[in-house]
Regions:
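Binding-site signature for planar aromatic cofactors or substrates
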Residues: 1-224
C-alpha cells in the first residue's frame, strides 16, 4: 500500500521563511524607532534627520549634491542591533505645494532645517545582518494617522511634569521640556532639547483610548 502524500499542518514550518519574517519585523521596528541616520552618496557621509508620512515614506531635507547621484544609502545605526542599510530613491517636492505639510511635520520634530532641498525618500531595498529586505515591507503606514494629532494633544495636556515622569519611568532619562510629537501603534515620539526620543509600547496598540490609558499610567506619580 502506497504511503499517502504528507499533508502540511500548522506545525510545519520553514526556518528560512521564519528567519526572513523575523528580520523584516526587526528591521521595521528599528527604523520606526529612529528619526536620524547617516546618508551616504558618492564619497559623502552626512547626518540625515527624517520623519515619516502617514503611508510610511521618509521625508528629509538634503544638500543639493545628494540630488544628483543614483546611489544613495541611509544607514540606521543602533547600539543594540545590527546596522540597517536602506537603498533609496529620492523624489524632490516643493514645500509650498500640496506636500508642504510634511515639511511642517519635520520642523515639529527637528526644528529648523540646515538644507532647503526637500525630498521623499522611498526605500527600494533594505539590508540587515546580511538579509535583503524588500523596501515596501519597511514603509509601514500609520493606522493611527487620523487620530495622531488628537492623541498628541491629549497626552501633552497631562503637563510637563507628567511627561518628565513618563521619560524618567520608561527611558530612565531626565528631559527638560518633553513634548509628544508622534504616535503610532509601536510607540510615542517625544521631542527633547537635542533629540527625538522613542518610547515603545509593550505590544502594538491601535485603540486611542488604550494608548491614553497606558501613557497616563506610566506618567502617574509613584504610589506610597
Amino acid at each position: 500500500m502506497a504511503t499517502p502524500p504528507h499533508e502540511p499542518d500548522n506545525q510545519d514550518h520553514d526556518p528560512d521563511i521564519e528567519d526572513g519574517a523575523a528580520a523584516v519585523e526587526e528591521a521595521a521596528q528599528l527604523l520606526q524607532s529612529w528619526t536620524h541616520g547617516d546618508l551616504r552618496f558618492d564619497d559623502n557621509i552626512v547626518s540625515c534627520k527624517f520623519v515619516r508620512t502617514d503611508e510610511g515614506r521618509l521625508v528629509a531635507a538634503v544638500m543639493v549634491a545628494a540630488l544628483h547621484t543614483a546611489d544613495t544609502v541611509l544607514m540606521i545605526p543602533d547600539e543594540h542591533a545590527p546596522v540597517l542599510e536602506l537603498l533609496l530613491t529620492m523624489e524632490p517636492f516643493d514645500e509650498n505645494g500640496p506636500d508642504g505639510r510634511w515639511v511642517d511635520r519635520w520642523r515639529i520634530y527637528h526644528g529648523e532645517e540646515d538644507d532647503i532641498n526637500w525630498v521623499f525618500l522611498d526605500i527600494d531595498m533594505g539590508r540587515m545582518s546580511g538579509i535583503i529586505i524588500d523596501g515596501d515591507a519597511l514603509m509601514v503606514a500609520n493606522v493611527l494617522a487620523q487620530e495622531e494629532a488628537g492623541l498628541c494633544r491629549a497626552i501633552n495636556e497631562l503637563g510637563t511634569t507628567a511627561l518628565q515622569r513618563l521619560c524618567r519611568n520608561r527611558l530612565d532619562k531626565d528631559v527638560e521640556a518633553p513634548l509628544v510629537v508622534g504616535v503610532d501603534p509601536g510607540g510615542l515620539d517625544v521631542r527633547a532639547k537635542f533629540d527625538v526620543l522613542r518610547i515603545p509600547f509593550p505590544m502594538p496598540m491601535e485603540l486611542p483610548e488604550d494608548i491614553v490609558r497606558i501613557t497616563k499610567d506610566w506618567a502617574a506619580p509613584a504610589k506610597g
